[in-house]
């Protein structure tokens, strides 16, 4: 059985601190992950003004806008991430949440793209990602069969390689909700590689997914669950 491609999802668990990000990258490398993944958003494009202006106390200020902006890295930080990943010899890539962020990631020579579960319903975004012609991991959390049909059709039409990632979008996911047999159903229905993006505590479900022949495994990482 071939080992799955291991993705350490850092997301925004760096808390806006490049030193924390580098520690997470090093830990992922030391633990045997093949790559680390970040999330990139253009805050003003992803959230509406009403949401951004709501009161929210955080280390970055008193509004949701302050918090969201405080958690975003920009080019200076991503340049450092790019260089550091080369230094420790690990791949990195990002899941963009809007087209501007997708274009931003073009600044770097990345092998992969990632469609977050929430973005699988955005037809325009899917088309733009598929046009990049980078191998793309497509998470299927919360999606219907029609959503997945549409995404697969777009990537095939653009001749862009992809794999689906079975995902249950609860945090943390209960073991009894894993529904791992979906992995086999996705393989059969779409004749493609299928991975697993896990949100559960522990490793038992992930190990079971590996036994079902997943080609990629994504797990969230942090230095401290209280951060």
Language-model-detected regions and their locations in the chain:
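Catalytic cores and adjacent flexible loops of soluble metabolic enzymes
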Residues: 1-227
